[in-house]
């Protein structure tokens, strides 16, 4: 059975009462193999000691407090790893934005949509902002039509996140990357590139008459 320790100037990010630090008369114990049971704290501590693990109070405000039978060091390690993985994901995933106008022409639409598609394939969320200048705000329908075109174009790699929303003279449309769609998109793209790289077939002369010798 362990006591909470710190090394040097490091402090644990999460602190739990464990073992002898748990002073309440009874606790609800969650077992590693599943299931739970309310028992006297001293019995729960004894059980933890017999198993060579720790009694960890994870929900002190519950009635009675909830404790887990687990190795304290492993629990902290798992929580730190989960926190690091979350931070890593937050760093690699960012929001990319491109602006459109309700009368955006086809060339500009295709060019910008290709960039949005690239951002999504790299795992980024994207926001398409449709800006209404001057009196063009009276043509809100064009903005929603453009949002639908964007949704259709990006549907091979993403899903639209909610409905388009107006804020002032701007219409915001959000898209979330879809892992499965992206994998399928990449497979189809690789196949198309492979086919395009194949040498052309020789001409079929089977139907032409043979020359007389």
Swiss-Prot record:
Signal peptide: none annotated. It holds the Pfam family IF3_C. Transmembrane segments: none annotated. IF-3 binds to the 30S ribosomal subunit and shifts the equilibrium between 70S ribosomes and their 50S and 30S subunits in favor of the free subunits, thus enhancing the availability of 30S subunits on which protein synthesis initiation begins. Belongs to the IF-3 family. Monomer. This is Translation initiation factor IF-3. It comes from Chlorobaculum tepidum (strain ATCC 49652 / DSM 12025 / NBRC 103806 / TLS) (Chlorobium tepidum). The gene is infC.
């Amino acid at each position: 059975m362990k006591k909470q320790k710190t090394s040097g100037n490091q402090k644990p990010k999460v602190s739990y009462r464990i073992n002898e630090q748990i002073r309440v008369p009874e606790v609800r114990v969650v077992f590693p193999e599943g299931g739970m049971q309310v028992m006297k704290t001293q019995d729960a501590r004894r059980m933890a000691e017999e198993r060579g693990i720790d009694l960890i109070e994870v929900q002190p405000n519950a009635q009675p407090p909830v404790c887990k039978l687990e190795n304290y060091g492993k629990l902290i390690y798992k929580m730190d790893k989960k926190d690091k993985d979350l931070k890593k994901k937050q760093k690699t995933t960012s929001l990319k934005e491109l602006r459109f106008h309700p009368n955006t022409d086809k060339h500009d639409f295709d060019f910008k949509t290709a960039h949005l598609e690239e951002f999504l394939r790299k795992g980024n969320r994207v926001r398409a902002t449709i800006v209404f200048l001057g009196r063009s705000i009276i043509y809100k329908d064009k903005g929603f039509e453009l949002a639908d075109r964007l949704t259709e174009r990006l549907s091979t790699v993403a899903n639209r996140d909610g409905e388009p929303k107006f804020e002032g003279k701007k219409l915001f449309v959000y898209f979330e990357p879809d892992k499965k769609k992206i994998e399928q998109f990449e497979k189809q793209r690789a196949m198309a590139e492979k086919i395009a790289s194949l040498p052309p077939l020789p001409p079929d002369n089977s139907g032409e008459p043979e020359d007389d010798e």
